[in-house]
């Protein structure tokens, strides 16, 4: 019984980590952060800014949360676990950037959305791979 309580605490902690990180990403995307992250990592034909990398990485963190949860035996959802978790990540990647259309001091940038979606895609790849690895399942 004590082991079950401990496992439930770990599972709840992992779920809080998922939703907590989602809130952090949301806040970082609606709070004015200044122009320091808009540094160019430029080639001659294409402007590539540092914040594009940060957008992708912020969504790639969800892959780490998934894997850590799975290592601890967390069942994220009763059914369609991979699909639901990935759906949350993809919908968040789109909606968080679209939200900036309605915030007066922020600007919607389709390249930011592409960077978000790239991070979400990498997350889905990691989730699918880890889901197929038997050592992560108890």
Segments predicted by a language model, with ranges:
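Bulky hydrophobic segments
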Residues: 2-111, 117-138
């Amino acid at each position: 019984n004590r082991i079950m309580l401990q496992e439930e605490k770990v599972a709840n902690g992992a779920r809080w980590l998922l939703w907590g990180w989602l809130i952090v990403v949301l806040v970082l995307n609606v709070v004015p952060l200044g122009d320091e992250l808009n540094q160019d990592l430029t080639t001659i034909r294409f402007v590539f800014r540092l914040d594009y990398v940060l957008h992708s990485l912020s969504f790639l963190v969800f892959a780490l949360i998934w894997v850590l949860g799975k290592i601890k035996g967390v069942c994220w959802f009763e059914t369609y676990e991979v699909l639901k978790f990935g759906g949350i990540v993809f919908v968040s990647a789109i909606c968080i950037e679209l939200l900036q259309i309605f915030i007066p001091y922020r600007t919607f940038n389709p390249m930011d959305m592409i960077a978000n979606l790239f991070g979400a895609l990498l997350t889905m790849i990691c989730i699918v791979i880890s889901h197929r690895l038997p050592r992560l399942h108890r």
